[in-house]
Amino acid sequence: SDLANANAVKELVIAGLLISSRKVISGIEWAKTLQGQEGVAKLVEKGKSAFVGPEIKGKRLGVIGLGAIGILVANAAHSLGMEVYGYDPYLSVDAAWGLSRSIIHATSLDQIYANCDYITVHVPLTPDTKGMFNAAAFAAMPDGVRILNFSRADLVNIPDMKEALASGKVAAYVVDFPTEDILGVENVIAIPHLGASTPESEDNCAVMAADELIAFLEDGNIVNSVNFPTVEVPRTTERRICVLHKNVPNMLSQISGVVSATVNGKHELKALV
């Protein structure tokens, strides 16, 4: 669940923002080539100008998708001095409570594309989102935009991304899902799917799985299921009956009648979920 690894991913996204700007990785690789040479300190001072990069403070970040991870990223980036735009047409009321008031509410993807120097995406892969970062999207962005993808590789049209990188439209692409067709491309920072790779995240996942099993076995609540919507109903009686059925007219009333006849008046039927 995103709730278990949200902080781990958030931290790596913030790292991605920094390394997409400051050319730290390429600078480190260059420094390794100086091994065995004389006057390394002087060589470093002479060569470091090739790795100049902008600060993120004061820049504009667009966060697409304001779920558990997106909200943490937006708030953290704002704390670092960025002007943050958030876009999510499906933002829940509960999620909105956790979003800083300072986050600018974008009403469309075009608003994100037109205004932001950095864009990070946190949405599921669906037929609508597959390839959403394509030539048309890049054309709407400012030159030198930096894009971070910690969601799914297929959100990005790779041939279009390569062209955008080659032209300078996209200054850097940070992706947590390396694929053969993107490896080795200049200005691509491919991270080996490390978003949730922390001991804390693994512990959180284990605890959450246990808690969710207990919630189902003891109260019938369903949370974070991959193939069923969330069902959370406060317990008001000692026992409850939950009926999962297709939306057939009068189905619940028929079942209620059968249950009422079965209990034969020995127990009060207060609720049928």
Model-derived segments and their meaning:
Residues 1-4, 151, 193-195:
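Short beta->alpha connector loops at strand-helix junctions that form conserved
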Residues 2-60, 224:
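Phosphate-binding beta-alpha-beta segment of Rossmann-like dinucleotide-binding domains, i.e.
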Residues 10-29, 75-82, 207-221, 256, ...:
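Oxidoreductase and adenylate-handling cofactor-binding alpha/beta cores
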Residues 59, 64-67:
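Glycine-rich Rossmann-fold phosphate-binding loop(s) that bind the pyrophosphate
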Residues 70-71:
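N-terminal Rossmann-fold NAD(P) dinucleotide-binding loop
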Residues 84-86:
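Short beta-strand "acidic-cap" motif of Rossmann-like dinucleotide-binding folds
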Residues 89-182, 197:
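Rossmann-like adenosine-cofactor binding region
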Residues 181-186, 194-273:
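NAD(P)-dependent dehydrogenase/reductase Rossmann-like domain
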